Amino acid sequence: MSLSPKLICKNVWKLYGDNPKEFLKSHNNNPDKEIIKKSGYIQAIRNASLEVYENEILVIMGLSGSGKSTLVRCMSRLVDPTIGEIFFENIDMGKLSKNELIEIRRHKMGMVFQHFALFPHRTVIENIAFPLEVQGIKRKEREKSALEIIDLVGLQGRENYFPKELSGGQQQRVGIGRSLAVKPELWFLDEPFSALDPLIRKEMQNEFLKIQNSLKKTIIFITHDFDEAIKLADRIIIMNEGRIVQIGSPEDLIMKPADDYVKEFTEDLPRERLLSVKSIMDDKKETNSSATVYEDEKIFSILEKVLSKGSVSVIDRSNNIVGSLSKETVSKFINN
């Protein structure tokens, strides 16, 4: 993940109702939610500011109606924000014409939704190649690109199947492949696996990480499943009533929840299986033991060693000592 922003949102609001821009202006662009409600408006997004870094997987979470999908649609300008600025690759999206926005979405953005709407009368290869057909690319060239994507998403040998001949997981692979056909710089996925059976869902999550490891895309991924978010995310956004409550790494949200709303998402999770040694280690580097553990190991995997040795040194993958971990710290973590 690079710290160079791929997409920036600044003070984005989305209200539904009569002349919402004037309403916001009359309240200094910061009305409280009670005034919004009493005035007959629906608050979809409230003053959202964030940066999406190049090559990161940014997961957006929240309950139904929290504004997740609306925020993503504002980011891609499928929905116009009421006020606020959105920059993609330093381009002010609010200043682009309708045709310029269409061109950016055709060539720079990929989108996958829960209901992926494959063309039933087109084969796998034809579905995946469709965005290239829209771009006017010749058939031979677009089919060559589509075959490469078919290999990438694990559908080798099924290129001439129709959607009705595929399982749900295979159909979703086609949807993912179609969204990758234009080689997008920014990839939006809105609950792409939520309709799948648990085993297929896990398989698709693993496949998704494999694809990301190969392509290094900038990804904005919506889910309501915290286990899925932790597995996939570099950072997570938690939303509530259109407002961004917290942005941070999975470990930040588990160890330092911003409020009770965030805490509710994380309190029943098996923390020892999700958190790394780094999240609970001590900064001091001196120990009475020669035993070591890696900072990125999950806590459950080193419990026996720490509890038997009393204390261990924590090292990075270059074998540099970066901290220590004591039996007392581990015991306190387990019992909290």
Task: Tell what function each PLM region has.
Residues S26-E34, E89-D92, E133, K140-G157:
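Conserved ABC ATPase "signature" region
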Residues A181-E185:
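A short, proline-enriched helix->beta-strand linker immediately N-terminal to the Walker B motif
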Residues N288-N320, L325-N336:
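The conserved cystathionine-beta-synthase
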Residues S76:
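Helix-to-loop junction immediately C-terminal to a conserved catalytic motif
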Residues R122-A129:
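Short coil-to-helix segment of the ABC ATPase nucleotide-binding domain corresponding to the Q-loop/switch region
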Residues I247-G248, K256, S324:
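ABC ATPase "signature
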Residues F162-L166, Q170:
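Conserved ABC ATPase signature
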